[in-house]
Amino acid sequence: ITPVHCPGHTPGTTSLFFEVPAMEGTEKEKLLCGIHGGLGEGTLTDSDMAWNDFPRNMRQIYCESIDRVIDMPVDIVLPSHAGHGVAYDFYQLAAQNDGSGRCFVDTGAWKRMLTARKNIVLALSNE
């Protein structure tokens, strides 16, 4: 497991990356799994940052931490919370799983997820 300090909704957020053996029928020998430990932007409103005594540049720190890991070649996104995923429902994917796990492989999901969250935080900065 490779931990990466990624300040997100709190200054101490950590993201984790680890490899798993690829399932039969994939081109790779190993797949990279990634979990971002704190994508929730709810603590980055002006009032919440003041309440939590976060530094005024916490939104910038959040965006910089996303930039550090956005290009990781993640094959399988593991959301830290059900609502912090990408544009699909992980419970629905799990229900459709044929036992192979292939339904969870999405090489573009990591970048889509982080880009969407970063854009939300950038919009907060422009309010």
Language-model region placement:
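Metallo-beta-lactamase
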Residues: 1-98, 102-108
